[in-house]
Amino acid sequence: MPSSVIMFTFLALTVLTAVMVGTSEAVSCMDNKNKPVDWFIVYKLPQDSASSKPVIREGYGQMYMDVNNQALKFSSTSLKDDDHAIAYTVDDIYKNHGKGNLAHVMYNDQPPAGEEIQSGLVGHTKGVLAFDGTSGFWLVHSVPKFPLPASKSYNWPDNAKRNGQTLLCITFKYDQFEKIGQQLKYNYPGVYDSDLPSKLVGKTPSIVDLVKNVHVTSPPWNRQLNLQSKSGQTFVSFNKASKWGEDLYKNWLATHFKSGLYCETWQNGGRNLNSSCEAGLNVYNVKKVSLSGGSDFKGTKDHSKWAVTTKSGLKWTCIGGINRQTSQMYRGGGAVCLENANVHKAFYDSVAEYEPCT
């Protein structure tokens, strides 16, 4: 057989394979250069009209770190634009809309305008799942009305300019998504947009359950699970149902890690939980955050949800969606934690002031 025919046959098979598999590249979190990355963290900064940095004045400033750049640094790229890690990551959903080669689920207790979520008391939880038959990402975040459904395109919502937010993106192999779905059934997420091609969800029935409004209805009311990122980093998912009825931070994370915590959560509502100092596990509410190279701000301007261990030698950081408020004890939700000295340092060192125990 002539070499030209062999080459043509090879190229034809390559193209056919790409079409059959779906997306040309495995689905992944993307970094600020639009390259696949195992995980990244974005700390969206509160709007500050007095800042010397235009993006912070406008309410679109961000700090960024990832597995390859393990220091939380200010990025001059505006979240309003589409050339940064968050936009690059969710763009896979938009560009593959209607093609049947990508599964996705968007959930948010405060969905975008015009979108509906399930009836009932859904969990206080926000995130995005997307995967093909090889890999995908889980974006855990605190941003109301984000992102827009797959039929639209990336846009940072105007309502999210004012306050601080946190976003954690993790890349997983396909086999982890059934486990993630099982965890999220405790959260009772408010799903407002989804696409689950049958060829991709045969091994992820729990993801299908999320879209069908199936959630945990019998004890135990909380569950933790180790998840492995695509590159082998262990993340621990802590998820609770509304009937668990306790504070995620004091009654679970602190006791699990056998450590005190600094907790930054939204406390602008009523019936806030005070800092707690019991049994040597001091759980402090952060009152002021100072991010080197970014900005300083009060907790009242920060809608993010994170916690760090305070015990010497422990380097755990948790990012999620639950606040330290009485009402949140009776809402589904959770946090995802990782043990990483650099991530821990970034968040631990940002604590400029905390509420003492009384």
From Swiss-Prot:
It is found in: Secreted. Residues 1-26 form the signal peptide. InterPro entries: DNase_II. Its EC number is 3.1.22.1. Venom gland. Keywords: Apoptosis, Disulfide bond, Endonuclease, Glycoprotein, Hydrolase, Nuclease, Secreted, Signal, Toxin. The active site is at 303. GO terms for cellular component: extracellular region. One of its GO terms (molecular function) is toxin activity. One of its GO terms (biological process) is apoptotic DNA fragmentation. Hydrolyzes DNA with an optimum pH of 7.2. Is potently hepatotoxic. It induces caspase-independent apoptosis (on rat liver cells) through the following procedure: binding to a specific receptor in the cytoplasmic membrane, entering the cell, entering the nucleus and degrading DNA. Belongs to the DNase II family. Plancitoxin is a heterodimer of alpha and beta subunits; disulfide-linked by a single disulfide bond. This is Plancitoxin-1. The lineage of its organism: Eukaryota, Metazoa, Echinodermata, Eleutherozoa, Asterozoa.
